[in-house]
């Protein structure tokens, strides 16, 4: 690498040429050279998934794509790592990237045991005494980036952060797929380029409705690099009684290797054998019809509510707010006392969000004003349903919102549809999330 986070200039071109004159075997990367002279690798940082695919699909792309920095693993993060690796595995020219970064760089404030003592050997009281600090923890006046030095795959105590498990899964080099659940045939793909799977064993277990019922091991795997072999997992199909059944597969080291011990799991898969059905047959028909027609009453204006009732269902919508005020089935409240359902455009900001100050940039969406304009109620006697459409004006975000409640009297089900219409060209920030 010629450097990081600087600019492009003639000195870097000369440095590139000098390196090539000394050693023609090694590729050179430099992010600011982009796709031109001075690099052998197109190595952008934080390149969007869509841009990566566009580059990978372009037959004129001049060099391999390896992001010099990506997957900013700060706090709750790494959710789209699979999107990148689906493309890496699809396009040979896209060859991965370098995570930012390895470890949270927080500092010990109080050391109760040497770092050679693993945290799991400490008791809870000792663990609570261990403190890690970052910018702002020492005083209020020194310049600080707060916790922006804590963006690692592992913690400052060298224990795995939650997102480390996603990184490990996406980077694993052995993959299993179900070929036939009836016969137990599973394909095993060795994604390694230079080694076979002779030092790995396949451990399997059958899980029925969350309980392990069968297990075993295939000790010898004969799969060359970049090849696939099919194995038969010897579970007894005749003994399966569960409604939801999974085949869990682990690939484990038979002998120790550098940094890894014998028996360590290096790859895994969970494959469906029997899938649980939400309903038998036509789910849409079952949602509407249930097990027979129920007598329904509709009171559209009484007590300032829209009320739909059957022997099993009580559904009420508040005419002053346009929102559900009560939903009970067989006498049990589905919302709890004072509960309601309302549109939501927010979620808890993550560390990465706060690094970009999105909690302030998007704050208009946290609790935007919703002015009720109209309520429309229609009863369909033939279908035994009631459709309620509430319309809102949302001036702070320059949009309109329609919420449709389709009440199925026969089953007590309520289908809710939100339709937000933004004003084209309006200067409104993005939102974190749209839901209810």
Where are these regions (language model features)?
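Extended substrate-binding grooves/exosites of carbohydrate-active enzymes
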Residues: 1-187, 192-213
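Solvent-exposed, conformationally flexible loop/turn segments
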Residues: 179-181, 223-228, 301-303
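Terminal connector regions
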Residues: 237-283
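A short beta-turn/strand-edge loop motif at beta-sheet boundaries
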Residues: 193-200, 241, 426-430
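Short, well-ordered beta-strand segments enriched in hydrophobic/aromatic residues
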Residues: 184-190, 308, 312, 390, ...
């Amino acid at each position: 690498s010629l450097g990081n986070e600087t600019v492009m200039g003639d000195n870097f071109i000369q440095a590139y040429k000098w390196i090539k004159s000394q050693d023609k075997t090694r590729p050179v990367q430099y992010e600011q050279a982009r796709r031109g002279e001075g690099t052998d690798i197109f190595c952008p940082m934080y390149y969007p998934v869509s841009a990566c695919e566009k580059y990978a699909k372009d037959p004129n792309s001049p060099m391999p794509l390896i992001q010099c920095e990506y997957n900013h693993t700060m706090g709750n993060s790494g959710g789209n790592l699979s999107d990148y690796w689906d493309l890496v595995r699809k396009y040979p020219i896209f060859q991965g990237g370098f995570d930012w970064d390895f470890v949270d760089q927080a500092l010990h404030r109080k050391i109760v045991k040497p770092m050679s003592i693993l945290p799991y050997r400490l008791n809870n009281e000792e663990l609570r005494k261990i403190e890690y600090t970052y910018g702002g923890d020492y005083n209020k006046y020194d310049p600080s980036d707060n916790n922006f030095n804590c963006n690692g795959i592992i913690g400052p105590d060298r224990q795995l952060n939650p997102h480390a498990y996603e990184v490990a899964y996406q980077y694993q080099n052995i993959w299993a797929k179900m070929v036939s659940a009836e016969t137990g045939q599973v394909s095993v793909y060795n994604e390694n380029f230079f080694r076979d799977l002779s030092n790995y064993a396949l451990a399997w277990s059958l899980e029925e409705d969350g309980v392990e019922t069968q297990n075993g091991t295939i000790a010898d795997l004969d799969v060359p690099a970049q090849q696939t072999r099919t194995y038969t997992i010897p579970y007894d199909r005749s003994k399966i009684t569960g409604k939801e059944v999974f085949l869990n597969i682990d690939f484990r080291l038979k002998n120790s290797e550098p940094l890894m011990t014998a028996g360590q799991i290096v790859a895994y898969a969970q494959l469906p054998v029997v899938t649980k059905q939400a309903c038998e047959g036509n789910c849409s028909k079952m949602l509407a019809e249930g097990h027979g027609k129920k007598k329904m009453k509709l009171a559209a204006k009484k007590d300032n509510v829209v009320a739909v009732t059957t022997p099993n269902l009580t559904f009420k919508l508040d005419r002053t707010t346009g929102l559900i005020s009560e939903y009970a089935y067989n006498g049990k409240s589905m919302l709890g006392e004072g509960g309601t359902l309302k549109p939501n455009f927010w979620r808890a900001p993550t560390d990465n969000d706060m690094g970009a100050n999105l909690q302030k940039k998007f704050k208009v969406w946290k609790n935007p004003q919703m002015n009720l304009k109209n309520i429309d109620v229609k009863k369909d006697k033939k279908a035994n349903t009631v459709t309620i459409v509430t319309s809102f004006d949302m001036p702070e975000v320059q949009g309109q919102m329609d919420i449709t409640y389709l009440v199925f009297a026969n089953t007590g089900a309520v289908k809710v549809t939100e339709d937000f219409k933004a004003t084209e060209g309006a200067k409104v920030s993005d939102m974190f999330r749209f839901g209810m």
